[in-house]
Amino acid sequence: MMIIVMLILSYLIGAFPSGLIIGKLFFKKDIRQYGSGNTGATNSFRVLGRPAGFIVTFLDIFKGFITVFFPLWFPVHADGVISTFFTNGLIVGLFAILGHVYPIYLKFNGGKAVATSAGVVLGVNPILLLILAIIFFSVLKIFKYVSLSSIIAAISCVIGSIIIHDYILLAVSGIVSIILIIRHKSNIVRIFKGEEPKIKWM
C-alpha cells in the first residue's frame, strides 16, 4: 500500500505545472497561449524570459530529483521482485516524469519531459547526467535545436544503459525516449521543413 502512495505522490509532484504557475503568478500570462503552447522549461524561456526560464528549469529538475529518494524516506519493504522493482529510484522518478508530461491538473497535457528527466538522472547517477549534458550541449552548439539535442541525449542514455547492462535504466530511458519523440513530433516536422526556430545564445 505504501508503495502505491509513494508512486502516486511522485506523479502528483511531477504534475506540478511550474511554468504555468510562474507565468500566471508573476507575468499574468498563461504560457499555454504563447510560443509552442507547452508548459515546460523551453517555452518558459521563450515566453517569460531567461530569469523565469531558469527558475522553471530548476523547479522541473527538482521535481524529478526529489522523487528518486522517496524509497529511502518512505517506510516501504522491498521483500519481493515486484516490490523491489517499484522501489527503485528510477522507477519512482519515472512516475514524476509521467506526471510532468501528462499532468492531471492540466487535462494530461504538460511538458516534454526533458528537465524532469534530467532531475531523475541527477538523483540516480550525476556522472551519467554530466555525460548526457555534454552530449546535449554539443549537439545544441552544432545544430541550434533544443528539441533535437534533447532527443539525441535521451537516445544516448538508452545506448549507454545497454553498454553498462543496466536494464532498469534501459527500460526507463527507452520509455522516456519514446515520450520525448512523441512530444517533439511537431518540432521534428518543422526541422525537416526548415521552420524550427534555432537558439541564438550559443
UniProtKB/Swiss-Prot annotation:
Keyword hit for Nucleus: no
Key words, A-Z: Cell membrane, Lipid biosynthesis, Lipid metabolism, Membrane, Phospholipid biosynthesis, Phospholipid metabolism, Transferase, Transmembrane, Transmembrane helix
UniProt cross-references to Pfam families, sorted A to Z: G3P_acyltransf
Pathway assignment: Lipid metabolism; phospholipid metabolism
Reactions this protein catalyses: an acyl phosphate + sn-glycerol 3-phosphate = a 1-acyl-sn-glycero-3-phosphate + phosphate
Bilayer-spanning residue ranges: 2-22, 54-74, 81-101, 120-140, 162-182
Primary gene name: plsY
GO MF assignments: acyl-phosphate glycerol-3-phosphate acyltransferase activity
Quaternary structure annotation from Swiss-Prot or TrEMBL: Probably interacts with PlsX.
Functional summary from the UniProt entry: Catalyzes the transfer of an acyl group from acyl-phosphate (acyl-PO(4)) to glycerol-3-phosphate (G3P) to form lysophosphatidic acid (LPA). This enzyme utilizes acyl-phosphate as fatty acyl donor, but not acyl-CoA or acyl-ACP.
Cellular component terms per the entry's GO annotation: plasma membrane
Gene Ontology terms describing biological process: phospholipid biosynthetic process
Name of the protein in question: Glycerol-3-phosphate acyltransferase
EC number: 2.3.1.275
InterPro entries, sorted: G3P_acylTferase_PlsY
The keyword Transmembrane appears for this protein: yes
Family, per entry: Belongs to the PlsY family.
